[in-house]
Amino acid sequence: MFQISNLLLAADFSSEVANNSAVGMIGSFIAAALLIVIPATAFLIFVSQKDSLNRTSTGRR
C-alpha cells in the first residue's frame, strides 16, 4: 500500500485535477439518477399502482 501511495505522489497529480475528477464523477452520478433511476422508478410505481387497481376491481366482480 505504501508503494502505491508513493507512486501516486511521484506522478505529481495536482489537487485541482483530483478535484475536477471528483466533481465530474458526482455530476455523472446525478445525471444517471436523473436520466435512468428516477424515470424507471416512476414507471414501476405507475405500473404497480395500475396493476393493484386492476386486481382489486376484478376481485370484486
Curated annotation (Swiss-Prot):
Keywords: Membrane, Photosynthesis, Photosystem II, Thylakoid, Transmembrane, Transmembrane helix. The keyword Chaperone does not apply. The lineage of its organism: Bacteria, Bacillati, Cyanobacteriota, Cyanophyceae, Synechococcales. Its main location: membrane. The keyword Membrane applies. PSII consists of a core antenna complex that captures photons, and an electron transfer chain that converts photonic excitation into a charge separation. PSII forms dimeric complexes. It comes from Prochlorococcus marinus (strain MIT 9312). Pfam families: PsbX. It is found in: Cellular thylakoid membrane. One of its GO terms (biological process) is photosynthesis. Involved in the binding and/or turnover of quinones at the Q(B) site of Photosystem II. The chain crosses the membrane at residues 26-46. This is Photosystem II reaction center X protein. Belongs to the PsbX family. Type 2 subfamily. GO terms for cellular component: photosystem II; plasma membrane-derived thylakoid membrane.
